[in-house]
């Protein structure tokens, strides 16, 4: 797939039209593909995401403690959440990667996907302003902000899914590693997850088996909650 031809489609999916398309291209460019890559934009986007989510939680939960606010923010801005957002946007289809990353499945690697989301946030800030970033991020996070609650230990997706199934006296999820790519120090795991009463088989891809299972479980939870 040639990413450049699909930038208009991606902009519609993101909900933002760039004035300077080069910023979007840079946000999608991994360091393996070009000298003008997305790492500086990622640095900027990481800070913007943190302050927007912090502000949203502060006003949404006026009685929450600092500890609760910190835990909720950590849940919303962590790499696994950003990877899920990237998958919702099918961001892997638009990334510019070097030959080595392409061969090793970099378009599915959670760290690359999460970094690209943050880079896009940074690109929107430079293309427009902070208000545009806030409006866009609140639209991306609407469902997650509606669902999150203070005073609750922010459990990981595997634990939530397991407890959900146990509550209905159903069998536990079946996780199977179906593929391992890359060298020992930089591997990518592909895990399939199946549960009873759900025909769809969900796939998670991560830098460890555990991370891949967590991503698969999170996608199952999203299907259940639809």
From Swiss-Prot:
NCBIfam families attached to this UniProt entry: RNaseIII
| Limits of the RNase III domain | 7-129
Q: Which organism is it from?
A: Shewanella denitrificans (strain OS217 / ATCC BAA-1090 / DSM 15013)
Q: Which family does the entry's similarity section mention?
A: Belongs to the ribonuclease III family.
Protein name as catalogued: Ribonuclease 3
Which terms are listed as keywords in the entry? Cytoplasm, Endonuclease, Hydrolase, Magnesium, Metal-binding, mRNA processing, Nuclease, RNA-binding, rRNA processing, rRNA-binding, tRNA processing
Where is it found, in Gene Ontology cellular component terms? cytoplasm
Whom does it interact with, and what assembly results? Homodimer.
**Boundaries of every DRBM domain copy:** 156-226
Query: What cofactor requirement does the entry state?
Result: Mg(2+)
Q: What is its EC number?
A: 3.1.26.3
Q: What does the UniProt function comment say about this protein?
A: Digests double-stranded RNA. Involved in the processing of primary rRNA transcript to yield the immediate precursors to the large and small rRNAs (23S and 16S). Processes some mRNAs, and tRNAs when they are encoded in the rRNA operon. Processes pre-crRNA and tracrRNA of type II CRISPR loci if present in the organism.
What's the name of its gene? Answer: rnc
GO BP terms in the entry: mRNA processing; regulation of gene expression; rRNA processing; tRNA processing
Q: Which Pfam families match?
A: dsrm, Ribonucleas_3_3
Gene3D superfamilies in alphabetical order:
3.30.160.20, Ribonuclease III domain (1.10.1520.10)
Q: Which SMART domains match?
A: DSRM, RIBOc
